[in-house]
Amino acid sequence: MYNSFPMRILRKLLMFFGLLFVAAGAISSLIGELTGIVTFSGLQNVSVSCMGVVTFWLSLERVHPEGYKFFLIFILLSSLLGFFYFPLGVLGFLLTIFVLWFFRDPERMIPSSETGIISPADGVICKIEKTLAPKEVKSSEELLKISVFMNVFNVHVNRAPVAGNIKEIIYVPGKFINASLDKASEHNERNILVLENNKNEEIIVVQIAGLIARRILSFVNLFDSLKIGERFGLIRFGSRVDVYLPSSYVPKVKLGQKVTAGESIIAS
């Protein structure tokens, strides 16, 4: 996916335009110093050079393919706005950078499955409690629920908390309440995965849309086998992930603690 031909071309284009922006800003400044001919103002030269540096950096950063279509839309609009009024072009470019940064998908140092349950999402632990499974899942057992809230600045690619087979996938349409609130687990749009690990335990993972997030993306299908830390989905622009574990598990995190998807141990 990341090394496909279209992705390689897009990364090379980002690198090319990044270097082009840096060169344009530097050459414009040099011409102004040597000849007195002002092609851009000092602020514009600095802005163009900064845009180049950031664009070049993004060509090196791993970005989820879902973000590239947003990049193309924003960069075209930014170019059009900048043609008519430079400050608007800079603003549009900054929004473009934020969109690409939002869809970043860095590699993670994934621990072995014997160490425990890893966090499915980047963010902050917002709930730890004993409760029942989501009503859409047929289970009457008391479970340990650990919730991770993701704000718009977190990485939003979700990863499998355990290795296992997908027994059930349930999509539930709903509202878009602030995902940090308890009622979001019951009322918001969500996607439920039921995994069975090598101990025949059921691990339930729920992706929940938030106040800004309007779409949950799933990369997996029923009966797929997932490795621990494997990417299974993404939620756009602020959201939450709930994990339901057998009650025998002990939480290894506390409320308010920051966690990293694919790396942080949340229970064992």
Please report, for each region that a protein language model flagged, where it lies by residue.
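Contiguous, well-folded functional domains in the mature portion of proteins
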Residues: 2-268
